A protein has these predicted regions:
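PLP-dependent aminotransferase-class I/II
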Residues: 120-143
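N-terminal glycine-rich, Lys/His-bearing helix-loop that initiates the first secondary-structure elements
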Residues: 1-55
Length: 143
């Protein structure tokens, strides 16, 4: 059983950073528990089917888990947004953003001085999906 506290509005960002999204278990920990598991036990097959279809509840730790949920809720509170998404790496975050914005037939203009792995992603991978890329100098406005 977890207990989530309701915090007063207009808290200082420092307070939000350490207090938002803490759900204490029956053990009363003072910070998030880290869930070091790959999967979560389901009460029955019907519940399991619903969770796998809807994404509500926890099924497999790589798709979502209480530790990541707490991070996402805290980040959203700090940024003043309704939601946030956590990624396992910077490239994971970059790929998620790009895949959410681009589609086949789009053309992207990028600086040659971007992060190397991002350059590689556009130079070698996105063409396979019909996304064209032009690389330009960041300092030469006539290019």
């Amino acid at each position: 059983m977890t207990v989530e506290r309701t915090l007063p509005p207009d808290l200082h960002p420092d307070t939000l950073a350490v207090r938002v999204a803490i759900e204490r278990s029956q053990y009363g920990e003072n910070s998030e528990a880290l869930y070091l598991t790959t999967g979560f036990v389901q009460p029955d097959s019907a519940t399991s089917a619903v969770r796998f279809q809807s994404g509500e509840g926890y099924t497999y730790a790589r798709t979502s888990n209480p530790t990541v949920t707490a991070f996402e809720r805290r980040l959203a509170a700090l940024e003043g947004t309704q939601a946030a998404i956590g990624a396992a790496s910077g490239m994971g975050a970059i790929l998620m953003m790009i895949m959410g914005l681009l589609k086949s037939g789009d053309h992207v203009i990028l600086s040659r001085s971007m992060f190397g792995s991002t350059l590689n992603l556009f130079a070698k991978e996105f063409g396979k999906f019909g996304v064209e890329t032009t690389f330009v100098s960041q300092t030469d406005v006539d290019e």
